[in-house]
Amino acid sequence: MALNWSFRVIFVSTMWCALLKFATLGEPKDDNDYGGGCPFVVLGNGTHAKPAGCSHLCNGAPETLDNIECYNVTEEVAKRMTPGIPYACWLGWCNKGECKRGNRTEVCYRGSEEE
């Protein structure tokens, strides 16, 4: 009787391990819909990244940001910045697609394309 019980425990344990292994082999499912948008150009400050401006064209249509901190720099200027060189950038706040400049600056830089 004990042999029969041991066999059942081993069999169930083996099947459970096999099930867990096969259940985790697939790619994780990503249920988020990113909407096929275009990424904004961002500038870093060593600890955080913020968008350069609050609007741009994506496939001919405007995309805007609202209610987040930004750098009051156009995407065109940000793209011309030399990667890794520190710049003084005006901080702002996105309001209806426009980066409203505040009264503070902070060091910002453009990262390399690999980042």
UniProtKB/Swiss-Prot annotation:
Cellular component, GO annotation: extracellular region
Subcellular location(s) per record: Secreted
Disulfide bonds: 38-58, 54-94, 70-99, 89-108
Sites where a glycan is attached: 45, 72, 103
Top-level taxon of the source organism: Eukaryota
Gene Ontology MF annotations: C-C chemokine binding
Assigned keywords, A-Z: Disulfide bond, Glycoprotein, Secreted, Signal
Signal peptide as annotated in the record: 1-26
Record function comment: Salivary chemokine-binding protein which binds to host chemokines CCL2, CCL3, CCL4, CCL8 and CCL18.
Name under which the protein is recorded: Evasin P1182
Natural source organism: Amblyomma maculatum (Gulf Coast tick)
Taxon lineage: Eukaryota, Metazoa, Ecdysozoa, Arthropoda, Chelicerata
